[in-house]
């Protein structure tokens, strides 16, 4: 890193090794955050300036990260997020779609790395059946993880008559971006593809459970966020066992998602 002769380092992390690495780069400007738990001379020594975190508990994660620019006199609280992909990405993903799916389809990503963020499979099946009855084609996506693909298979089994096609585990992130960008609507849970849809400007319906909604809701999204906390009590996000079998999104009624998706 020192050999790259960086002019500036922006350290968004709160870990000690990141601060030390920032110092070791030799960059003339090294900005970090003034985390209360890091108010120590060594933390200050590793950086040339520290940005305030005083308002972070009220800000979206994007705004928190952008606030590191404050020592430079820059205020970019509403900067748009964007995601790109190549024509080759779209060509590759388009070739995987049936001919009659290549326009006006809905993408549904029912999975997340953490299953406590997922909606029950039979409810996803009911949603797909309702959309299919209205004439919509649905593309199902997921990551390559075996558990995610098994979830998708279970959902498909509940939709024997639906106009449905699965690309679960078959796409790179940029190919997935191309598929989402050409969709009429994205429906998904609190996961990376939801944020991709927001960055691509695709209308979305996002299902949220016990995540910190202020921090992690889709940034500047077109569409709606359905929060499980509006339908019943949720645990504190910081107290969740991420390996739990609990499906906290099950508080969200199927009809509420169908109504916002049609």
Predicted regions and their residues:
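Catalytic machinery of carbohydrate-active enzymes
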Residues: 1-262
């Amino acid at each position: 890193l020192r050999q790259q002769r960086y002019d500036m380092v922006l350290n968004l992390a709160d870990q000690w090794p990141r601060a030390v690495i920032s110092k070791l780069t030799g960059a003339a400007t090294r900005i970090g955050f003034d985390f209360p738990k890091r108010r120590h001379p060594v933390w200050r020594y590793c950086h040339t300036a520290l940005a305030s975190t005083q308002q972070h508990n009220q800000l979206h994660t994007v705004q928190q990260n952008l606030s590191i620019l404050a020592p430079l006199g820059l205020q970019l609280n509403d900067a748009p997020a964007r995601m790109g992909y190549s024509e080759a990405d779209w060509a590759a993903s388009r070739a995987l779609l049936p001919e009659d799916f290549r326009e006006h389809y809905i993408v549904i990503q029912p999975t997340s790395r953490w299953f406590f963020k997922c909606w029950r499979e039979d409810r996803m099946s009911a949603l797909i059946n309702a959309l299919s009855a209205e004439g919509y084609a649905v593309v199902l996506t997921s990551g390559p993880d075996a558990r995610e693909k098994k979830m998708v298979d279970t959902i498909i089994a509940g939709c024997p008559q639906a106009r449905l096609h699965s690309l679960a585990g078959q796409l790179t992130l940029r190919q997935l971006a191309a598929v989402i960008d050409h969709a009429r609507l994205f429906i998904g849970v609190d996961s990376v593809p939801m944020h991709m849809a927001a960055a691509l400007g695709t209308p979305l319906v996002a299902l949220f459970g016990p995540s910190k909604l202020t921090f992690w809701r889709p940034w500047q999204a077109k569409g709606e966020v359905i929060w499980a906390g509006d339908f019943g009590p949720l645990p504190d996000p910081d107290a969740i066992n991420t390996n739990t079998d609990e499906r906290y999104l099950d508080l969200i009624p199927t009809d509420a998602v169908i109504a916002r998706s049609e």
